[in-house]
Swiss-Prot record:
Protein name as it appears in the record: Ribulose bisphosphate carboxylase large chain
Native organism taxonomy: Eukaryota, Viridiplantae, Streptophyta, Coleochaetophyceae, Coleochaetales
Residues that bear N-acetylproline: 3
PROSITE patterns, per the entry: RUBISCO_LARGE
Organism of provenance: Coleochaete orbicularis
Gene designation per UniProt: rbcL
Function, as annotated: RuBisCO catalyzes two reactions: the carboxylation of D-ribulose 1,5-bisphosphate, the primary event in carbon dioxide fixation, as well as the oxidative fragmentation of the pentose substrate in the photorespiration process. Both reactions occur simultaneously and in competition at the same active site.
Length: 475
């Protein structure tokens, strides 16, 4: 045998393949305050012990590979390796387990959600020993979260900028989402803002298409904002989507929005990417722009119960990367969202400190320290009859966004906006008077209809509209 390949006594290296669990399954490990903790829902292939599967997840998402390598001896694996420190069976499921993995902080670059995700979920989800794998939650320690700027401004600063307090904010996505000219688009924005909404919004797939180039849209929308502000005396905004094919083009659009003097822009953070999103967030803080975030493509990643990444993880990632608003589902509308699960990640977006609560899908206590909060945006298939439930579920620190529920009003856009504003004001007043929105919501709306013909017409149109389908992603 060549002396270059011979295994010598005492060197600690022996070529070959060994079980992951011999190195990466450490049930005796006590987690550190600085560890990043992950909860994976894993479904091993038949015949693969859960300890081996959990150890494989820890190994392949940190320092491990499929065989022993001699360069392991050139570093301290014990310092850098991920550790599967606990495994528990999932109640009611055969061959499904929650594996808890601890990662040392030194594995991750500061201020980089991109690097965090590349490490933890970048490779291991295709591992053959696993039939399915889902990242259910992450615990981000303050030692790591404090390296991030977080949201450009946060909830309180946004309220101060808008001078609006004590109620949810009202929005509307302009429809049809594609096909309008820039001038007609601006007209719809003006009518909605003039009717009483706080915000209007570009749809997530409105970028710069042949029927409406971005610069034309920005100019006509800015005119609509300033005209509606002058007539109502309220600060108004429109989420101008800066998402583009390159980061450089995205920044050019953001800069033009700032030059126009508008208050808020928008980004599709999953399709645009975390690196672009963090750059845009930093620009928004430096230049006084609010940043609305759309989660386009999220259901591809988070909707299946057994495989992918839960949205609570994507929400935490967004809070670190930066955004002042993010779409969160509605509970009552057309899009997926179980109530307790939705409220769990809404709290993770807004609050400073969130206790572990498995009944809401929260696997770890999360301390954001001083990082600003993010406003959840309820949007998708909602209308005036939903207003009491939305006000009760989401509270004041939220944006309630009605697209078809505004523009579908039989009398037009402005009356649709009036109907939503009246319904919201009625619900907030009733709540402040001590009435139960959950039980008396319909009565509150009917009473408001008596002095608002716009609301009465909206109630008549949507009185039978419901989206009653079973939620796929349950606890």
């Amino acid at each position: 045998m060549s002396p270059l390949t011979e295994t010598k006594a005492g060197t600690g290296f022996k070529a070959g393949v060994k079980d992951y669990r011999l190195t990466y399954y450490t049930p005796e490990y006590e987690t550190k305050d600085t560890d990043i903790l992950a909860a994976f829902r894993m479904t091993p292939q038949p015949g693969v012990p859960p300890e081996e599967a959990g150890a494989a997840v820890a190994a392949e998402s940190s320092t491990g590979t499929w065989t022993t390598v001699w360069t392991d001896g050139l570093t301290s694996l014990d310092r850098y390796k991920g550790r599967c420190y606990d495994i528990e069976p999932v109640a009611g499921e055969d061959n499904q387990y929650i594996a808890y993995v601890a990662y040392p902080l030194d594995l991750f670059e500061e201020v980089s959600v991109t690097n965090l995700f590349t490490s933890i979920v970048g490779n291991v989800f295709g591992f053959k020993a696993l039939r399915a794998l889902r990242l259910e939650d992450l615990r981000i320690p303050p030692a790591y979260s404090k390296t991030f700027q977080g949201p450009p401004h946060g909830i309180q600063v946004e309220r101060d900028k808008l001078n609006k307090y004590g109620r949810p904010l009202l929005g509307c996505t302009i429809k049809p989402k594609l096909g309008l000219s820039a001038k007609n688009y601006g007209r719809a924005v003006y009518e909605c803002l003039r009717g009483g909404l706080d915000f209007t919004k570009d749809d997530e797939n409105v970028n710069s298409q042949p029927f409406m180039r971005w610069r034309d849209r920005f100019l006509f929308v800015a005119e609509a904002i300033f005209k509606s502000q002058a007539e109502t005396g309220e600060i108004k905004g429109h989420y101008l989507n800066a998402t583009a094919g390159t980061s450089e083009e995205m920044m050019k659009r953001a800069q033009f929005a700032r030059e126009l003097g508008v208050p808020i822009i928008m980004h599709d953070y999953l399709t645009g990417g975390f690196t672009s999103n963090t750059s845009l967030s930093h620009y928004c803080r430096d230049n006084g722009l609010l940043l609305h975030i759309h989660r386009a493509m999220h259901a591809v990643i988070d909707r299946q119960k057994n495989h992918g990444i839960h949205f609570r993880v994507l929400a935490k990632a967004l809070r670190m990367s930066g955004g002042d608003h993010i779409h969160s589902g509605t509970v009552v509308g057309k899009l997926e969202g179980e109530r307790e699960v939705t409220l769990g990640f809404v709290d993770l977006l807004r609050d400073d400190y969130i206790e572990k609560d498995r009944s809401r899908g929260i696997y770890f206590t999360q301390d954001w320290v001083s990082m600003p909060g993010v406003l959840p945006v309820a949007s998708g298939g909602i209308h005036v009859w939903h207003m009491p439930a939305l006000t009760e579920i989401f509270g004041d620190d939220s944006v309630l966004q009605f697209g078809g529920g505004t523009l579908g009003h039989p009398w037009g856009n402005a009356p649709g906006a009036v109907a939503n504003r009246v319904a919201l004001e009625a619900c907030v007043q009733a709540r402040n008077e001590g009435r139960d929105l959950a039980r008396q919501g319909n009565d509150i709306i009917r009473e408001a209809c008596k002095w608002s013909p716009e609301l009465a017409a909206a109630c008549e149109v949507w009185k039978e509209i419901k989206f009653e389908f079973e939620t796929i992603d349950t606890l």
